C-alpha cells in the first residue's frame, strides 16, 4: 500500500496507522518532494507543481517495484495518487481516501483566499496566504473539529512546523497553493476514471474538516456506486484521533 500524505505534514502522519496494518500489508509512506525528509530543491531548480510531484512518485513506485498496490491518499496526496490511478488503472487494487477530494462540492469556503490567488496570482494575493504557514494555523488545523483536543499528540504539529520553518519552505508551499488549481481542473478527469474503472473505494473522512467537506466524500458514490463511506467525529487530520478505527475499516474493506 502506498500512503500519500498532505499539507503541511509528511510520512510521519501515518505513524499510528502503520503499526496497525504492518502485519498484513507492505506499507510505503514517502515524503513528497519539498516535505519532511525528502529533498527540498529551490524553486529555481525544481518547479513545484502537483504534476511534477506525481511524476516523481510515479518513478519512486517504479524503482521500488510496486506493480499492483492500493493507495491511501490524504489532502495533497489525493491529486498525486489520482494522477497515478489515471495513468496506471491496471496497477491499482484499491483506493482509500482520507479527506482526499476530487469534487467541487468538497471544497469549503476556507479555500476562498487561495481561490483569490488562482483568479489573480498577484503578489498581494500570494502574501495573503502566508498566514496558512503560521505555527498557530498548523495547530488549529490539527485541533479544529476535534471534540477532545487532549487526544492529539503534539509531536505531529510540532514536527510539521519544524519543516515549515526551514529556509525556503514558505515559497515552495505558496507555489503549491497556487498550483492546486491544476488539481481542480483535473476533477473531471479523475471522475471519468472513477466512472470508467469503478475501483474498489473506501472513504474515511473527518466530518468536521474545515477545508474538505463531507459532500466531497459522498460525491464519490456518484461515480463509484459501490464506494464505502465512513465519517468520523473529528477534523482534517483524522488519523490523529481515529487511527485505530480507520485501521479497522481498512482491514475490513480490503478483506472483502
Segments (PLM) and residue ranges:
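Active-site pre-Tyr helix/loop in NAD(P)-dependent dehydrogenases
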Residues: 7, 101, 237
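Short hydrophobic "strand-cap" motifs at the C-terminus of beta-strands
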Residues: 4, 30, 204, 234-235
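Catalytic histidine-centered segment of alpha/beta-hydrolase-like enzymes
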Residues: 234-247
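A short, glycine- and basic residue-enriched loop/turn
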Residues: 10-11, 79, 235
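Conserved HGGG/HGGXW glycine-rich cap/lid loop of the alpha/beta-hydrolase fold
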Residues: 1-37
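Short, hydrophobic alpha-helical segments
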Residues: 250, 254-256
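Conserved acidic functional residues
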Residues: 6, 75, 240-241
